[in-house]
């Protein structure tokens, strides 16, 4: 999805549930097939039936089925036709227990889907802060970007996942980092009217003076979205 205005930059750029980086018609199928035939870590040499059952169980949120498939030899890094591992599927579907199972089984925490969505991005989007913390501890790449040049911080900020945003800041993410279209995390939060997240970012040193590639500040973006409380927060010199 291209982002050509503030509305498209922010509000229209993160539909829910997690739908990120769709390719043009035709390309998607080709990319998905290439991802399937290039599965890493020797997946094709293993029991494809067990792999298929693992992914189906993950999609259904079936903890028992996941455990059985793993016991039967399924690869922890098996991926479906769009390149999603059971871990990514679990995180997208808000199945933290299942996600923990896959993490404990040794799934590659940086193995993303065809669209580039990594486990950390999926967890950040869902606001699964404990899992974000665990992923970071296991070496998840915090600066990884997907096909739309978005990352864990932009997803967390846009979704108003304040606890996750604070955790990412503590992990070393610059509150004034510039992302695609010269957007900052503050702009993403402002564009969705996430006042609490805006406040947390301001308190962490995020600048309200930065401008995107249209010359708009976070305040301008909040005004365009008619987010009254967010506008008040950005206008206020005191930010309790």
Segments predicted by a language model, with ranges:
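Ankyrin repeat A-helix N-terminal signature
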Residues: 56-61, 89-95, 122-128, 155-161, ...
């Amino acid at each position: 999805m291209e982002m050509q205005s503030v509305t498209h930059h922010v509000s229209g750029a993160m539909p829910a549930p997690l739908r990120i980086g769709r390719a043009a018609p035709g390309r998607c199928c080709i990319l998905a097939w290439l991802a399937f035939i290039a599965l890493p870590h020797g997946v094709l040499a293993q029991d494809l039936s067990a792999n298929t059952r693992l992914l189906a169980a993950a999609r259904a949120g079936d903890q028992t089925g996941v455990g059985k498939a793993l016991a039967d030899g399924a690869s922890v890094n098996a991926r479906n036709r769009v390149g999603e591992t059971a871990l990514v599927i679990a995180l997208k579907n808000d199945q933290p227990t299942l996600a923990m199972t896959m993490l404990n089984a040794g799934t590659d925490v940086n193995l993303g889907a065809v669209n580039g969505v990594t486990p950390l991005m999926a967890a950040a989007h869902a606001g699964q802060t404990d899992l974000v913390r665990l992923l970071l501890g296991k070496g998840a790449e915090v600066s990884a970007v997907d096909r739309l040049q978005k990352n864990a911080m932009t997803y967390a900020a846009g979704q108003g996942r304040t606890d996750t945003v604070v955790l990412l800041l503590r992990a070393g993410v610059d509150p004034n980092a510039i992302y695609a279209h010269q957007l900052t995390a503050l702009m993403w939060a402002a564009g969705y009217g996430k006042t609490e997240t805006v406040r947390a970012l301001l308190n962490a040193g995020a600048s309200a003076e930065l401008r995107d590639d249209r010359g708009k500040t976070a305040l301008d973006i909040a005004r365009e979205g008619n987010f009254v409380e967010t506008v008040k927060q950005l206008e206020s010199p005191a930010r309790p």
